[in-house]
From Swiss-Prot:
Part of the 50S ribosomal subunit; part of the 5S rRNA/L5/L18/L25 subcomplex. Contacts the 5S and 23S rRNAs. Keywords: Ribonucleoprotein, Ribosomal protein, RNA-binding, rRNA-binding. InterPro entries: Ribosomal_uL18_bac-type, Ribosomal_uL18_bac/euk. This is Large ribosomal subunit protein uL18. Belongs to the universal ribosomal protein uL18 family. GO terms for molecular function: 5S rRNA binding; structural constituent of ribosome. Gene3D superfamilies: 3.30.420.100. SUPFAM superfamilies: Translational machinery components. It comes from the Bacteria. NCBIfam families: L18_bact. It holds the Pfam family Ribosomal_L18p. This is one of the proteins that bind and probably mediate the attachment of the 5S RNA into the large ribosomal subunit, where it forms part of the central protuberance. GO terms for biological process: translation.
Length: 119
């Protein structure tokens, strides 16, 4: 019988396999109880082109404490989009890593779209 974590990892594996076939840059989101992380990977999946998280000092200055909020995810989404555009990345595939597209994950994706990333 599968637990919640195994089910999430199975969904993530399926998504990553489909994105790998497309050979495009991938925006990956990882969510914990206290932080949210976002990274843009190259099409081969071995090189990180841009990253942002609520664990960064610059992001923490913008937040009023907790890094596990929708507002924090919005800041991270905007920041990772700016860094990706600076690295020359305009279009990505969104990898939600098996997490539901709701709440913090959705806020990060919406902020990245508003900042100019296309997916």
């Amino acid at each position: 019988m599968m637990n919640k974590k195994d089910a999430r990892l199975r969904r993530a594996r399926q998504t990553r396999a489909k994105i790998a076939e497309l050979k495009v840059n991938r925006l990956t989101v990882f969510r914990t109880n206290s932080h949210i992380y976002a990274q843009v990977y190259s099409p081969c999946g071995t090189q990180v082109l841009a990253s942002a998280s609520t664990a960064e000092a610059e992001v923490r200055k913008e937040l009023n404490g907790n890094g596990a909020t929708v507002a924090a995810a919005t800041v991270v989404g905007k920041r990772v989009a700016e860094k990706a555009k600076a690295a020359g990345v305009e279009t990505v595939a969104f990898d939600r890593a098996g997490f539901r597209f709701h709440g913090r994950v959705k806020a990060l994706a919406d902020a990245a779209r508003e900042a100019g990333l296309k997916f």
